[in-house]
A protein has these predicted regions:
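Short, well-ordered beta-to-alpha junction loops that form the rim of enzyme active sites
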Residues: 58, 89-93, 138-140
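Short acidic, glycine-rich surface-loop motifs adjacent to enzyme active sites
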Residues: 80-103
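Extended active-site neighborhood of metal-dependent phosphoesterases/phosphodiesterases
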Residues: 1-81, 85, 107-134, 142-185
Length: 191
């Protein structure tokens, strides 16, 4: 992980990582300790041009957002009177059971049965001054059975799934935000 971070530092001033099960496994593990030594935090937030980004950890309590992360979200939302977009970035597709279309992430269907995505969504809905809420997840695995790229809009909520590992339709998302922060463009980059 340290060598990866050093390489990324050549290109980016700030690096925010949503840890996945290949990075830290599930729960409290030795791999998680190494991850925290390298990246210092397992979840974070930042503002960029009146857009608020949350990078969350869904591996410590598998498929869930922990209480300390929910507290961070509430605190950060209370700091701004108006936002253009709110981005929620996770490894696991915690919203898999909340979209209309059928998506297949890398985990079994029952993985998210007891998750607290509804609680997260309720917190976000209490904040009224935003244009859109964009959920991005990347746990599409190395199998060919998973959905490789997905986008669904439901009211002001956007659900995006991206990822790599199978060598078929591997992709990442390029997010561009206008100078004023009001226009957001998200484009898949395939390789």
């Amino acid at each position: 992980l340290l060598s990866v971070k050093k390489e990324l530092n050549n290109f980016f001033k700030n690096i925010y990582v949503a840890p996945g099960n290949h990075d830290v496994k599930l729960g409290s593990t030795d791999e998680r300790k190494v991850f925290l030594q390298v990246f210092k935090k397992n979840f974070n937030s930042f503002f960029f041009k009146d857009n608020l980004f949350f990078i969350l950890d869904t591996t410590i309590n598998p498929g869930n957002i922990t209480a300390d992360q929910l507290k961070l979200i509430k605190n950060e939302l209370s700091k701004k009177k108006k936002l253009n977009s709110i981005f929620i970035i996770t490894h696991h597709v915690i919203w898999e059971n909340y979209v209309k279309q059928n998506v297949q992430s890398a985990v079994k269907k029952n993985f998210f049965l007891n998750n607290n995505f509804g609680q997260l969504k309720k917190i976000l809905l209490t904040y009224k001054n935003y244009k859109s809420i964009i959920f991005i997840a990347g746990d599409v695995s190395v199998t060919n059975k998973t959905t490789k790229l997905f986008c669904e809009k439901n009211e002001n909520f956007y659900y995006l799934m991206t990822g790599m590992g199978s060598k078929n339709f591997d992709n990442y998302l390029k997010i561009s935000i206008s100078e004023q922060g009001k226009s957001v463009s998200i484009v898949p980059v395939f390789f």
